[in-house]
Amino acid sequence: MLTLDTLNVMLAVSEEGLIEEMIIALLASPQLAVFFEKFPRLKAAITDDVPRWREALRSRLKDARVPPELTEEVMCYQQSQLLSTPQFIVQLPQILDLLHRLNSPWAEQARQLVDANSTITSALHTLFLQRWRLSLIVQATTLNQQLLEEEREQLLSEVQERMTLSGQLEPILADNNTAAGRLWDMSAGQLKRGDYQFIVKYGEFLNEQPELKRLAEQLGRSREAKSIPRNDAQMETFRTMVREPATVPEQVDGLQQSDDILRLLPPELAKLGITELEYEFYRRLVEKQLLTYRLHGESWREKVFERPVVHKDYDEQPRGPFIVCVDTSGSMGGFNEQCAKAFCLALMRIALAENRRCYIMLFSTEIVRYELSGPQGIEQAIRFLSQQFRGGTDLASCFRAIMERLQSREWFDADAVVISDFIAQRLPDDVTSKVKELQRVHQHRFHAVAMSAHGKPGIMRIFDHIWRFDTGMRSRLLRRWRR
């Protein structure tokens, strides 16, 4: 069967112009105009999708099949082009009957053209074929437009669904244009309204806990750029004025204990003339406990020193992925569970904004994994947020899973984050030594987010940084009172 792409080539119909008109009409639709005004960050992300839309439309037109009636009419037209005028005159009745049988738009006009001329000349033959070709071009263009209209409706429906999802999640997850673009890419999955309400719910909870949000931001910024001295910098002499105590004091400021013989009080000096107190005088002299005058004074002098002319290099510290381990034991239920999930959502927001990866592992009796920054990040986040925290605590397995992932090439610069109340058994010696090796040799950093003030110090001592967020009732009331 004839394809629409072949028909367009045969009739020299340009589908590119039709595709561009359709895309312009789609972008100018009132729904998108309102959305762009409300969420300007997502405008660029949607605009970046236009090449993909264009390619999808080309593919749709290329693979579309031409209706059998139109295919038969096109074949008849091609055969008629090969006929001479005498042959065309002989075949004309069959051609007219075929057009009538196919309900061709050209059928009625063709018969009128033939009836209006008693003799079929070469010029009439050419005119007949030209008008027939125009009729076929109109039919092909109409077919293209119908298919594009169907695609436009389908595409608009898809875009509206993604706009609804992205519009709901943009205030929660999109901190800049980069995050907005990644959020738009992740919104392509098949999600229902009830699904992403989990993210909205924990986003609202995070806004109610600004201290928790700030804690996540501090952890995300913890690998800041720093300056380091240059070894090859040239030295230059600098002079500056410094203030120091004067050699000749200006006034008496009080009394003090010291060994300053020149400023002894008369009663202390009198002890030297008493034999019984002489040794006591020397003892207090050695111990600097003689009462003396305290004199006060200061002066300025010039200090000369050398320092490098350009003494610092800017050492940009890379910000790698997050590997987050979340304790899902029974003691982490309730408010602790809400805080842990909201904290992971805050890290996901940071990862999207800074083009980093965010990998979540839940540990209790088994380990469950989610990647919140991948193409299916929203679906993964929903699955994570819908998990219930019930089980035991196996912190050693958590560390082993982290260390296994850190040894892979794509996670070599990752930061490991463990969220727990750290009420657990001590870590085995082999785990502790392996963690210290990763910290020392590979510069991996381990962060602890402590949800309790009663975590075991022996466990927490292994971490580079400890971020405390006490979820006890007293701390919660204090935070609420401060707000």
UniProtKB/Swiss-Prot annotation:
<dbReference type="InterPro" id="IPR008912">
    <property type="entry name" value="Uncharacterised_CoxE"/>
</dbReference>
<keyword id="KW-0963">Cytoplasm</keyword>
<dbReference type="InterPro" id="IPR023481">
    <property type="entry name" value="Uncharacterised_ViaA"/>
</dbReference>
<comment type="function">
    <text>Component of the RavA-ViaA chaperone complex, which may act on the membrane to optimize the function of some of the respiratory chains. ViaA stimulates the ATPase activity of RavA.</text>
</comment>
<comment type="subunit">
    <text>Homodimer. Interacts with RavA.</text>
</comment>
<dbReference type="GO" id="GO:0005829">
    <property type="term" value="C:cytosol"/>
</dbReference>
<dbReference type="InterPro" id="IPR036465">
    <property type="entry name" value="vWFA_dom_sf"/>
</dbReference>
<keyword id="KW-0143">Chaperone</keyword>
<dbReference type="Pfam" id="PF05762">
    <property type="entry name" value="VWA_CoxE"/>
</dbReference>
<comment type="similarity">
    <text>Belongs to the ViaA family.</text>
</comment>
<protein>
    <recommendedName>
        <fullName>Regulatory protein ViaA</fullName>
    </recommendedName>
</protein>
<dbReference type="InterPro" id="IPR002035">
    <property type="entry name" value="VWF_A"/>
</dbReference>
